[in-house]
């Protein structure tokens, strides 16, 4: 359990920021369900394209939480650039913290809730 302390801390940080008005951007509906299952209660937006997503979020504090794979990294990079045109610097560190020491077990946001349940012993 101690090995996963950074994972749990990152999840707690995500929940706290979400409760305080930060918008979480994910890749799909399964990602939304996974985050809701672990208690993320704030607004979650599904990525629809760089320009449209950035325009929707231009006046918000944003957390980009895409998968830790090539496609997710590509979306993250493009969305960071699109948000910069509005003078916004999104949070990508929570994603790094979540996936940093669990890459062997999970790489997708939709897998977070099942993994959380497995290692915490808490039924979601």
UniProtKB/Swiss-Prot annotation:
Residues that coordinate or bind Mg(2+) 1: 27, 67
Domain Toprim: 21-98
GO molecular function, one term: metal ion binding
Positions annotated to bind Mg(2+) 2: 67, 69
Signal sequence interval, chain numbering: none
InterPro entries named in the record: TOPRIM_dom, TOPRIM_RNase_M5-like, UPF0292
Keywords linked to the UniProt accession: Magnesium, Metal-binding
SUPFAM superfamilies cross-referenced by the UniProt entry: Toprim domain
The UniProt record lists the keyword Cell inner membrane: no
This protein's record includes keyword Signal: no
Cofactor detail note: Binds two Mg(2+) per subunit.
Cofactor(s) this protein requires: Mg(2+)
HAMAP family for this protein: UPF0292 (MF_01095)
Membership in a protein family: Belongs to the UPF0292 family.
Protein's UniProt name: UPF0292 protein AF_0905
């Amino acid at each position: 359990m101690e090995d996963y302390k950074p994972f749990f801390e990152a999840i707690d940080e995500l929940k706290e920021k979400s409760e305080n008005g930060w918008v979480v951007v994910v890749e799909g509906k399964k990602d939304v369900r996974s985050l809701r299952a672990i208690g993320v209660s704030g607004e979650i937006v599904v990525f629809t394209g760089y320009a449209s997503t950035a325009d929707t979020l231009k006046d918000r504090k944003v957390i980009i939480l895409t998968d830790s794979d090539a496609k997710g990294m590509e979306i993250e990079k493009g969305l960071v650039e699109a948000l910069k045109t509005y003078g916004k610097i999104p949070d990508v560190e929570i994603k790094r913290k979540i996936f940093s020491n669990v890459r062997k077990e999970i790489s997708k946001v939709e897998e977070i809730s099942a993994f959380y349940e497995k290692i915490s012993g808490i039924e979601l």
